[in-house]
Each structure stands twice: as structure tokens, then as C-alpha cells.
Amino acid sequence: SMSESMSELEIARIQVILQYLTVHDTINSAKAAELLDVEKKTASRLLSKAEKVEVLISKGKTKDKVYMKK
């Protein structure tokens, strides 16, 4: 589950992303970084973590990867 494998900060950030995804279909790491005011690599790590715990799903190759709600 999300709470076991993530810090409170990560969970809070994922909530922001999920909120964004209620309005938009997809998000990428650049947009997530902007939204969370973090570096792009931090955002990508967070997105892939969210995918690992099955909160998000992704499509596309690394460079153009987008994430959406499961």
C-alpha cells in the first residue's frame, strides 16, 4: 500500500498529483515538478514510485512517459 512504502511528504505530493489528475487526463515529470516545485528528477522518482504501488499507470517511453490514474 501507499502508506507502507512512502514518507508522509511523498504521500502528500502524490495527493497533489492525484488532484491535478481529476482535471487533466495525464501528467508528466516536467509538469509534476512544476506543480510540486521540485526538481524534475525528484518528480520522476515520485511518479515511478506511485506507479510501483499501483496508484498511477504510465504509458510511453522514458522521454515521453505520461502517467494517469489507474
Language model regions located:
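C-terminal regulatory or interaction extensions
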Residues: S1-K70
